[in-house]
Amino acid sequence: MDSYLISIAGNIAAGKSTLTKALEKRTGGRIMSFLERVDYVKENGYLQKYYEAVSAYDRLKGTKLVGKDRNDFLKVKEAAEYWGYKIQETYFLSRLLDLGVLSELLREGQSVAQDRSIYEDQIFTKNSNNNEYITDEDYRRYLDLFKLVMRNKPTPDLIIYLESDVAALKSRIVGRSRGEESELADPGNSYLSNLNDLYRPWIMKCGFPYLIVDTEEIDFRTEQGLEQVVGDIIRTVPGTKDLFD
């Protein structure tokens, strides 16, 4: 049986881990769930520092500041740019290590459903550059590094994009109560909205077979919803049928 790499894509709290685990259970392990490794980022407090830094910068952007207030603003901007690049660099290196593990699993004939692939880094990095969390120079450096490093790396046989509206994402973030994400649920925080604006254009041009699953229309936590997703997977990549039989 051929092995397949299915990458689950989507905004924060879109349900990627949920679908990844559901596919593993549905196939009796013929598809192995491979969850995003974020322990290193969380243990070092990087994620919370990043969200705090960029949220502080967003609150001050566009205001007219002089004197001490202006100096304070520049410090906030500097912190946002530092953590903007730091967090992206850390995630990129972590996902690069994951690719090594995935390559071995695929060579051994194990199909994998992956919670967020390294290719989604392009969305988060572009968002950071758009919002001045990453300088133009650092953004160009990242793109050059990405192209160089990703040569001859395994590519997804299918990307499933879980599309969700921002209100639903914020509701899920509140519900799962992860402290480092609390800033994202604030009514005036536009971080999730900015990412959402980038996702659909990205998936349409990703260069891989893809599915778009509207999470407001399809609840894959239910048997009926999951079977609808499974049917769409098989229609898009017919070779995966044996995994679900």
Where are the regions a protein language model picked out?
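Conserved lysine of the Walker
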Residues: K16
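Hydrophobic anchor at the beta1->P-loop junction of P-loop NTPases
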Residues: I8
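Conserved substrate/cofactor phosphate-moiety recognition/catalytic segment
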Residues: K25-K86, I123-F124
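P-loop (Walker A) phosphate-binding loop of NTP-binding proteins
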Residues: N11
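A glycine- and Lys/Arg-enriched "phosphate-lid" helix/loop adjacent to the NTP-binding pocket
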Residues: D121-L198
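NTP-dependent small-molecule kinase module
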Residues: S171-D245
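Glycine-rich phosphate-binding loop used to anchor ATP phosphates in small-molecule kinases
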Residues: K75-K153
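Hydrophobic positions on the alpha1 helix immediately C-terminal to the Walker A/P-loop
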Residues: L19, L23
